[in-house]
């Protein structure tokens, strides 16, 4: 039987970690929101600029999320060591992570630039692709800075500090809006650049992010000590393999998930520019709710990794259940909000009547899959925390590649449901997420039996 008193302390501990991560995650997605809103207003009744940033952002996102996903593997490793008080090994992971993840950022940047010729073969209107490419290039140039920032961010999350990343992201978001205002609209003597100006603003703010967080590390003695522990002797192929072993399944899971969203966005382009813009509005809203879900999932990983490091099964079980309670409550709230305001929200993005009408219908469908999405992300967070990540990728493949995209295509094109059919594919695709709960419960049983 559920008793609030049993979980009160767990809710407080989870929320203490999750709320700053919520602000950080929202801050990251609000970079794209700011670009879309300001470019959408710049375009007025012409949906091309908004469609361009939507398309460019979608293509960028798929490799961006794959790179960032590998860095997420650092958090549970540091969380376990933090609970065990092993500062020396934590410093070694940080040192190797900085080298590995930053080099990975340059690699991802190169891959993103190599994709540019393919953008003309994705079924999008030529004028949309022409406008999207300069914006996309500037986003690609930001990848090394993103990966450098994420190395420090994931380390801090591992030691239970989620506030610093929040402050850095908020400050850089304000910078992004200011730079957008200058470059998109041509203020302070600069040329009016439209969508390209949004890319410049985003690049500038992302360069500032690692500078700020590195400055914090050097300012605080307890974190500077980790940097002072760096030594050429600490570079280790074995350590990098461990980072890759943890990060790669997470990255592939996020890559497949992003592929489903990007694939859906590309198929929207096969319908019309109106569908592209309406989908971007609906997905931007869904992403805002999703980022809060992933924040709860990230906090879950931190709590679970600390409990796992301390080998406290009872605390781990309570923390996991509390995370499920929190995410279910949030997703119910989000779904009700989307349904209530589906006709109002699109008007903040555009004045085009056709886009507003279609976006309001898509927002209703976004509300449908909120609950399953939340349960899936908390389950993934738990499995990351106990370092059981191998199962994550196969289930993601089943969800997004076997179910989501084919069903979306079937409904959207074969059965003629259009944009609404493509979005309904996500509802079907999230069904296999229940297997993640089965895996977590199996791990707990094995741990109780002394197998883990």
Set out the residue ranges of the language-model regions.
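Small-residue-rich hydrophobic transmembrane alpha-helices
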Residues: 50-109, 113, 146-165, 278-342, ...
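N-terminal transmembrane alpha-helices
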Residues: 6-37, 41-45, 58-73, 77, ...
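Transmembrane alpha-helix boundary and packing residues in multipass membrane permease domains
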Residues: 21, 25, 36-37, 76, ...
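Helix-terminus/linker motif at the lipid-water interface of multi-pass membrane proteins
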Residues: 26, 30-51, 119-126, 182-193, ...
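Alpha-helical transmembrane segments and their lipid-water interface positions
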Residues: 28, 32-39, 64-71, 75, ...
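Transmembrane helical elements of multi-pass membrane transporters/channels
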Residues: 16-35, 138, 158, 172, ...
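Short runs within selected transmembrane alpha-helices of multi-pass transporters and secretion channels
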Residues: 68-71, 139-157, 165-173, 198-214, ...
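Short alpha-helical transmembrane segments in multi-pass integral membrane proteins
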Residues: 1-18, 78-144, 190-248, 304-369, ...
